[in-house]
Amino acid sequence: CGALWSCPVEQAGQIPYKFVVSFFQHHRMLQLKDRPLWLTVKGGSARYVRAIQSQANITFRKTGVLHVSRSVNDVVVETTQGSERFDWVVFASHADDSLKLLKDPSAQELDVLGKFRYQDNRMVVHSDTSIMPKSRRQWASWHVHVTPTQATEQMPFQHSGTHYGFSYWMNQLQNLNCTTQVFATLNPNFALNPKKVWVERHYR
């Protein structure tokens, strides 16, 4: 659970049992045989994002939203480039960010959106093959890394408090046409070769 939901081991035990079992059943993770074959979108998520954008009537693009307010007949979205009125608005953002954007949140919105909590995560894209099994036959699309260690000065890429990390083998998942092995490691709990680190991002 700590690896699947990127949370510290002490919090993983607090996840409701029914939710865990339901998740495992839905993703066929309890099957020992005839497991489903997972597919990925060729070109990555950017491809279907572009497809949606090509069909959408976009008023503002890459524009910061200041706040959203409601009137009797419509919803007003105020941005750094002006404001626009809409019949309704769908928030595709974290619950706490959505709550901050609402200029006049209702009691129900305050109650529901205020209950969400998030875990900070670090994603590192790199080509350090030392994280993988020595035998190439044991390489898989993703690997779980379990260690009890904490971040130290000698391990700058480690995420403090997280004992579970895992790596995606991007060549396998995205069919990359290159000889360099590329990995995306979430919450690395081991030292990575700094010379082989390409990109580092932080998410919630």
Language-model region placement:
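Mid-domain catalytic core of redox enzymes
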Residues: 66-204
